[in-house]
Regions:
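A short glycine-rich, Lys/Arg-flanked "PGG" loop and its adjoining helix->strand segment in the class I
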Residues: 34-51
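Residues lining hydrophobic/aromatic ligand-binding pockets adjacent to catalytic sites
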Residues: 8, 21, 58
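Conserved SAM-binding strand-loop segment of SAM-dependent methyltransferases
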Residues: 1-11
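A short hydrophobic/small-residue beta-strand
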Residues: 52-53, 143
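C-terminal lobe and adjacent flexible extensions of AdoMet/dcAdoMet transferase-like proteins
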Residues: 123-173
């Protein structure tokens, strides 16, 4: 496993047949310049015909929760018999398509007493279908498939939670 900044990833020219940027991480590149750099770096590491899988949130769905309201995201039991509560709120800058999120982690012990609270500021871009297709084309990729979920369901803009892109390297840049 390699941990590096994907914008400047240098794994050798044409070394791989498959690349994946998991967990919607690509959307954390909020600047178009950074998105282009990342796609070019991935492109460079793939062989001709190599595939790149890039899951993104569906902006039509994801933007609905970027309204500033505090939302519970989940409660999870801990190994010690306690509880982890994850919540957060987010706002969308409609002019840039960037969401600012403040994620809260509350740790409770087995007696339900609050032991710790952590805050994680996050930023991510909501990249629409045509915008990502244009970025991919500019980096030398063609879409092979676009799924609406991780079960490879059909992408329906009005209802699919995700855009799971499968791209193929078609040309050298």
């Amino acid at each position: 496993m390699l941990r590096a900044d994907v914008r400047y990833l240098d794994l050798g020219e044409g070394e791989f047949i498959l690349a994946l940027i998991p967990l919607h991480s690509f959307s954390e590149l909020v600047l178009p310049r950074d998105q282009k750099l990342a796609l070019r770096a991935v492109h460079g590491s793939l062989r001709e015909g190599g595939r790149f899988v890039c899951p993104l949130p569906n902006p039509a769905i994801r933007a609905r929760s970027a309204d500033g309201a505090l939302r519970l995201n989940g409660s999870f039991s801990t190994a010690e018999g306690g509880l982890l509560v994850v919540s957060g709120f987010e706002t969308l800058d409609e002019s840039s398509g960037v969401v600012d999120r403040l994620q809260l982690y509350e740790f409770f012990d087995a007696s339900k007493e609050l032991c710790a609270k952590r805050v994680l500021p996050m930023r991510f871009a909501l990249i629409d279908r045509s915008g990502f297709a244009e970025l991919a084309d500019g980096a030398g990729f063609v879409p092979v498939a676009l799924y609406g979920d991780y079960d490879r369901g059909e992408y329906v803009e009005e209802s699919s939670p995700f855009m799971v892109w499968v791209l193929e390297k078609t040309r050298r840049l």
